[in-house]
């Protein structure tokens, strides 16, 4: 073994198929400065899908079905994040409060059936002004691994329901209102990651003016709050045909050291992990080489695996 370096091989117990060789400097060499703190044994690169739904809401299938697809596609970890119940009303696409026990049971069942795949317990929660107490109540009900925060409503206006809804709107004004709510969601510190950041582009209604400063202002709020944002492949399956968020948005996020999660926003099991090769390439092009992993609301950063 040379005096300047030696090779150590790290094997992840949770992703046995992945093996990585890391070069470690000699004891006399200066320690490198890491952009993000890394924990031992997490030099192993991973692909993690933290956004998927079930038949309890507006999806199909159950967590076991999502897990089966994830294994087929070579994912290293997944998280179920069905739509959480709203505090004061029921809809066709949110769980009822009485569904929570069933949902948690389904996730536990998937964990038992697929022990080789880490499956995390999460929720996607709509941020609505005044929801804070309800989200805190939800947090105390079960040992959640993470919460995704989303903005689907601007007042009573549904952000992602139809192009017809947008056709009569002042688009720039609606985008500004959306990001005002998005900043509030970040500053609430109720969420671990914010899903599909530029959701208003879904139907290709985009601002006519330069929104760089709006994006930067929103992302500063995220950075100050210590929240992650999601890189979502769902937009590739929508009229916008684009990953959420846009490249300029994600580059600003990287400059501000905002961490990321990956998500497919799968509403059918077949979409779990869809286009994750493109997502990984896109994230790397914007400067990212790490993604978030959550356990019991605690975050760590792991290397982003290339596909």
Pin down the residues of each PLM region.
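An N-terminally biased module of ancient metal coordination in phosphate/nucleic-acid-related enzymes
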Residues: 40-129, 203-213, 217-218, 233-236, ...
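Hydrophobic residues within beta-strands of alpha/beta enzymes
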Residues: 78-80, 147, 194, 229, ...
């Amino acid at each position: 073994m040379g005096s300047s370096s030696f090779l150590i091989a790290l094997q992840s117990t949770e992703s046995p198929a992945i093996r990585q060789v890391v070069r470690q400097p000699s004891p006399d060499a200066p320690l490198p400065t890491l952009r993000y703190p890394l924990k031992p044994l997490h030099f192993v690169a991973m692909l993690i899908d933290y956004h998927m739904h079930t038949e309890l809401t507006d999806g199909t299938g159950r967590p076991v079905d999502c897990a089966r697809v994830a294994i087929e596609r070579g994912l290293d970890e997944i998280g179920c994040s069905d739509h959480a119940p709203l505090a004061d009303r029921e809809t066709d696409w949110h769980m009822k409060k009485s569904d929570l026990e069933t949902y948690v049971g389904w996730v536990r069942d998937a964990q038992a059936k697929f022990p080789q795949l880490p499956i995390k317990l999460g929720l996607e929660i709509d941020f609505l002004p005044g929801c804070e107490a309800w989200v805190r109540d939800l947090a105390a009900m079960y040992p959640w691994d993470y919460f995704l925060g989303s903005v689907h409503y601007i007042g009573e206006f549904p952000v992602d329901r139809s192009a017809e809804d947008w056709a009569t709107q002042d688009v720039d004004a609606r985008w500004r209102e959306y990001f005002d709510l998005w900043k509030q969601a970040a500053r609430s510190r109720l969420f671990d990651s914010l899903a599909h950041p530029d959701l208003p582009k879904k139907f290709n209604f985009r601002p006519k003016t330069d929104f760089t400063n709006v994006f930067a202002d929103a992302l500063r709020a995220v950075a100050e709050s210590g929240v992650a944002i999601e890189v979502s492949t769902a937009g590739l399956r929508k009229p916008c045909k684009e990953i959420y968020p846009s490249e300029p948005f994600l580059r600003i996020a990287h400059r501000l050291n905002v961490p990321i999660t990956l998500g497919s926003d799968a509403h059918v099991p077949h979409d779990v992990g869809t286009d994750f090769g493109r997502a990984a390439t896109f994230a790397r092009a914007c400067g990212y080489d790490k993604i978030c992993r959550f356990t019991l609301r605690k975050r760590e950063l792991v290397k982003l695996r290339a596909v």
